[in-house]
């Protein structure tokens, strides 16, 4: 992790929600970006991890892979009604000009009565999107449309 040991932090944005996620590896920064996004929706500490989803995605570049990863998790929340609390990215590979991610997301079936959500996220955007290698590892900046 980097930026004084933080997993992520929220930044000021006029209309949407912007955050930066940190990690020692690309895999860790993707995990922490997912955690930051789900903590916008709900307090992830209140969620059990009894439901798992395997995720495999391919994208033309690392930035698109991050957007696709977060968008897939948001899709699973909206369609399968699963809220996630933990993310395990096994690997991110670059091969033949494409990036791929193999990961697992752990959470539980969403129940509005016991788990009221805080903020609805409409979409993950490319606005101000950045993924950079830093002296401490990796940093990703993401803006989500609310």
From Swiss-Prot:
Membrane-spanning intervals of the chain: none
Database matches in Gene3D superfamilies: Archease domain
One Pfam family this sequence matches: Archease
Domain of life of the native organism: Archaea
InterPro entries in the record: Archease, Archease_arc, Archease_dom, Archease_dom_sf
GO BP: any one term: tRNA splicing, via endonucleolytic cleavage and ligation
Chain positions recorded as Ca(2+) binding sites: 16, 145-146
GO MF entries: calcium ion binding
This protein's UniProt keywords: Calcium, Metal-binding, tRNA processing
Functional description taken from the UniProt entry: Activates the tRNA-splicing ligase complex by facilitating the enzymatic turnover of catalytic subunit RtcB. Acts by promoting the guanylylation of RtcB, a key intermediate step in tRNA ligation. Can also alter the NTP specificity of RtcB such that ATP, dGTP or ITP is used efficiently.
Alphabetized PANTHER family for the sequence: ARCHEASE, PROTEIN ARCHEASE
Family: Belongs to the archease family.
NCBIfam families, A to Z: PRK00407.1
HAMAP family: Archease_arch (MF_01222)
The name this protein goes by in its record: Protein archease
Protein species of origin: Methanosarcina barkeri (strain Fusaro / DSM 804)
Lineage, opening ranks: Archaea, Methanobacteriati, Methanobacteriota, Stenosarchaea group, Methanomicrobia
